[in-house]
């Protein structure tokens, strides 16, 4: 059975059709409308910083558990940093075949540092990556919102000091 599945994947690759990480034992692929629906890169590319941050943290855990050497971890971190730098510089790193930000980052990393790039996926699922990315994203946005709140409070305080003692019309509602 493994030979048959490998042969089908080989044939699909030769024909130029797309094979995704979730294809496997099925003889035919998903309907194109479902494939289009499941691709989220255009939406979750905004999570690139969080995805890379999560991968760096996960890599550290792999080093601590003895799965990854410190030298390999450094290569992975350098590769991830170069991806983020290129993304911020406006370089288009993505391909149409990239289903989501996780697969896109892993693909680019593997292209840059070789098979070592695939090790970053060891011991975690895409669901783990999605949850981590969203938690980091929300933490970052909450920090930004707190900074804006502080700025607003400082502005209100400055205005209160500037206009202290001045009359100001106030209404609880319009009637």
What are these regions (language model features)?
Residues 2-175:
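A helix-coil-helix interface module used to build multimeric assemblies
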């Amino acid at each position: 059975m493994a030979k048959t599945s490998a042969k089908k994947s080989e044939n699909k690759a030769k024909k130029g059709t797309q094979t995704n990480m979730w294809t496997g034992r099925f003889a035919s692929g998903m309907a194109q409308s479902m494939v289009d629906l499941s691709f989220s890169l255009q939406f979750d590319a905004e999570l690139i910083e969080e995805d890379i941050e999560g991968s760096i943290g996960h890599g550290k855990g792999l080093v601590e558990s003895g799965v990854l050497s410190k030298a390999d971890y450094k290569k992975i971190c350098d590769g991830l940093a170069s991806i983020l730098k290129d993304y911020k510089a406006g370089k288009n790193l993505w391909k149409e075949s990239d289903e989501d930000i996780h697969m896109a980052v892993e693909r680019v990393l593997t292209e840059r540092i070789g098979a070592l790039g695939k090790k970053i996926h060891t011991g975690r699922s895409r669901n783990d990556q999605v949850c981590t990315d969203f938690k980091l994203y929300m933490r970052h946005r909450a920090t930004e919102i707190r900074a804006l709140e502080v700025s607003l409070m400082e502005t209100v305080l400055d205005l209160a000091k500037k206009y202290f003692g001045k009359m100001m019309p106030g209404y609880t509602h319009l009637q």
